[in-house]
């Protein structure tokens, strides 16, 4: 039976996903057969696993760190928020339905069987399984029926390490407070803690570590400094987008409106890695920069609602002005659907609003349909006749005259559309900029000099650098031998 360790946080965005990815690479480098697992994830940043279902992109990255194919069983329950009150529920890669907050709390006990089945599948043939929790175990109002944190840990008898984020302040209180609020049974599952995102001289926190141990009885497994490699890895939580600030002037400014239900925003990461490209996230209430050469409308979990948000923020008028100035626009997935004249949802799949006018930048229309397309694809970008690898996760069928100038060819059918002047493009494919040759040709078309950036190699190098950093600051031997 594989050994397992679960990393739970004192709150969201403490860095659990990246820590688990780095520790997966540490274990792999030590010759262990290691696998990632997250019982429940909430994210619109989904990936298509190697076995053809939807999982969180964090688990996809963790599988890459392990050097193994990704599987739906690595993230058996995925919640994709569609509104402020409800989410689409994905179980073992497939859509189970939709659930509002209270109904989902009632549904969770039924999902534990799927979680435990997937955990058993992931554990087969593994030496070590590194498990990631969700949110915080101190949310005791959600403890009944919990499958994400202590509910899973106690059911599967997996020891827990708590992760505290010192960068946001109050890490001593958050760890000691978690100890105080946990039940005696849950507290017994915790073997210790580690501190993440420390800046400066770590020895200055020695007294802090001693205080946490004095109040809780938990041992410290180490303090992780702010590691630069983390910034070169795909992020899962959209909260990182809110921190983006403009940097030095680059050859090309790419503006990205921050849609309320933005999805798969790691599509932008390869552009951020380009030395002559500045990616500017445009938050609600802000204007699209006038110096942008390209505007990317990203994916979204709720196209109609986010199309209304585009209009409410005045981005529709700003996009029209951008195009009149000679600017380029790329729409990805839901962003592609917004580029057309009209979006209709006769079955109410996305909500009570059944139709909305689009931006009218492409001569296309979209009808939402119940069947969801989820697949990895190999394609050819027709504008440059270069290969692409990407993935589709969408509902809706798009038709119209501009589909006669497709963005890509996938097997026997075409994808996307390009305007007659070539400045407006749309595609259902996520991950297109991961393809180095396509990205270079695309940027050259926008006047940016070709670079030698190999994006996938850069991610692998960042994982290796992260693993090296964790080896230096954590007691890995003690962690990997927890019982």
Swiss-Prot record:
BP term (GO), one: cobalamin biosynthetic process
Pathway(s) where this gene product acts: Cofactor biosynthesis; adenosylcobalamin biosynthesis
SUPFAM superfamilies linked to this entry: Class I glutamine amidotransferase-like, P-loop containing nucleoside triphosphate hydrolases
Residues at the catalytic site: 333 (nucleophile), 430
Gene Ontology terms, MF aspect: ABC-type vitamin B12 transporter activity; catalytic activity
Residue ranges of every copy of the GATase cobBQ-type domain listed in the record: 251-438
Domain of life per record: Bacteria
InterPro entries: Class_I_gatase-like, CobQ/CobB/MinD/ParA_Nub-bd_dom, CobQ_GATase1, CobQ_N, CobQ_synth, GATase_3, P-loop_NTPase
Keywords recorded for this protein, A-Z: Cobalamin biosynthesis, Glutamine amidotransferase
The family this protein is said to belong to: Belongs to the CobB/CobQ family. CobQ subfamily.
Main function: Catalyzes amidations at positions B, D, E, and G on adenosylcobyrinic A,C-diamide. NH(2) groups are provided by glutamine, and one molecule of ATP is hydrogenolyzed for each amidation.
Descriptive protein name: Cobyric acid synthase
Species this chain originates from: Brucella anthropi (strain ATCC 49188 / DSM 6882 / CCUG 24695 / JCM 21032 / LMG 3331 / NBRC 15819 / NCTC 12168 / Alc 37)
């Amino acid at each position: 039976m594989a050994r397992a360790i679960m990393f739970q946080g004192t709150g969201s965005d403490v860095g659990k996903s990246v820590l688990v990815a780095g520790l997966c690479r540490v274990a792999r480098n030590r010759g262990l057969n290691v696998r990632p697992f997250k019982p429940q994830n909430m994210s619109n940043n989904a990936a298509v696993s190697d076995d053809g279902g939807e999982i969180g992109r964090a688990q996809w990255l963790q599988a890459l760190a392990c050097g193994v194919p990704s599987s739906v069983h690595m993230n058996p329950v995925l919640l994709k928020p569609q509104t402020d009150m409800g989410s689409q529920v994905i179980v073992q890669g497939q859509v189970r339905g939709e659930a509002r907050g209270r109904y989902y709390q009632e549904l969770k006990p039924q999902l534990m069987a799927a979680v435990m089945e997937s955990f058993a599948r992931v554990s087969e043939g593994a030496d070590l399984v590194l498990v990631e929790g969700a949110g915080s175990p101190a949310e005791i109002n959600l403890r009944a029926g919990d499958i994400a944190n202590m509910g899973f840990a106690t059911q599967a008898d997996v020891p827990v390490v708590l992760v505290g984020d010192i960068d946001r302040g109050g890490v001593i209180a958050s760890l000691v407070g978690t100890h105080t609020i946990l039940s005696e049974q849950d507290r017994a599952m915790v073997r210790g803690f580690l501190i993440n995102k420390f800046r400066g001289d770590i020895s200055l926190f020695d007294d802090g570590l001693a205080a946490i141990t004095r109040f809780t009885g938990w041992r410290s497994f180490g303090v992780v400094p702010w590691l630069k490699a983390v910034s070169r890895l795909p992020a899962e939580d959209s909260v990182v987008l809110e921190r983006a600030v403009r940097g030095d002037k680059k050859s090309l400014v790419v503006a990205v409106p921050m849609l309320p239900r933005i999805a798969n925003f790691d599509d932008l990461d390869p552009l951020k890695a380009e030395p002559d490209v500045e990616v500017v996230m445009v938050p609600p209430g802000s204007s699209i920069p006038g110096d942008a050469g390209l505007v990317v409308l990203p994916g979204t979990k709720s196209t109609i609602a986010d199309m209304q948000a585009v209009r409410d923020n005045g981005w529709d008028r700003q996009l029209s002005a951008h195009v009149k100035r000679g600017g380029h626009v790329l729409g990805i997935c839901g962003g592609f659907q917004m580029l057309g004249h009209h979006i209709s949802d006769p079955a109410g799949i996305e909500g009570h609003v059944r139709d909305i006018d689009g931006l009218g930048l492409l001569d296309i229309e979209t009808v939402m349909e119940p069947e969801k397309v989820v697949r990895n694809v190999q394609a050819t970008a027709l504008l440059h006749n270069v290969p692409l690898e990407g993935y589709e996760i969408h509902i809706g069928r798009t038709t119209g005259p501009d589909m006669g100038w497709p963005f890509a060819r996938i097997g026997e059918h075409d994808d996307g559309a390009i305007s007659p002047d070539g400045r407006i493009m749309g595609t259902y494919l996520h991950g297109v900029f991961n393809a180095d040759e396509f990205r270079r040709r695309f940027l050259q078309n926008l006047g940016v000099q070709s670079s030698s950036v190999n994006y996938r190699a850069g991610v692998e190098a960042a994982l290796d650098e992260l693993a090296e950093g964790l080896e230096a600051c954590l007691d890995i031997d003690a962690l990997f031998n927890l019982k």
